[in-house]
C-alpha cells in the first residue's frame, strides 16, 4: 500500500505536467526516477502514468498507488 496519498490537487499537477511535458521526480520502492511526463494510462485497471527517461528515451510506466512520492521539478 502506498504511503503517498493522491489528492485532487496532486492529480491536477500530474495532468498539467503531462500536458506541458515537464519533468517529474517520483519514488517507487526506494528508487528515485526523474522522467518527462508523457500520458496517463491504466494497467490492470489501476491508474498510471507514462514517463520518458531524458537520457535514454526509455518509456517507463508508473502505477500511481505504488508511488511513495511525486514532485514536478521543472
How would you name each of these model-derived features?
Residues 1-17:
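Mixed-charge, Lys/Arg-rich low-complexity intrinsically disordered regions
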Residues 18-28:
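A short, Trp-centered hydrophobic/proline-enriched beta-strand micro-motif
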Residues 26-34, 60-63:
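Short coil-to-beta-strand transition motifs
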Residues 28-30, 44, 55:
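A generic beta-sheet turn/junction motif
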Residues 33-41:
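Short beta-strand-centered aromatic/proline hotspots
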Residues 45-50:
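Short aromatic-glycine-enriched beta-strand elements
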Residues 51-60:
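Short solvent-exposed strand/turn elements
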Residues 61-74:
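Structured surface patches comprising rigid loops and adjacent beta-strands/short helices at the edges
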Amino acid at each position: 500500500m502506498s504511503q503517498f496519498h493522491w489528492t485532487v490537487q496532486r492529480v491536477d499537477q500530474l495532468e498539467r505536467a503531462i500536458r506541458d511535458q515537464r519533468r517529474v521526480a517520483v519514488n517507487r520502492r526506494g528508487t528515485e526516477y526523474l522522467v518527462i511526463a508523457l500520458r496517463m494510462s491504466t494497467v490492470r485497471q489501476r491508474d498510471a502514468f507514462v514517463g520518458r527517461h531524458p537520457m535514454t528515451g526509455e518509456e517507463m510506466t508508473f502505477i500511481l498507488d505504488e508511488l511513495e512520492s511525486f514532485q514536478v521539478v521543472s
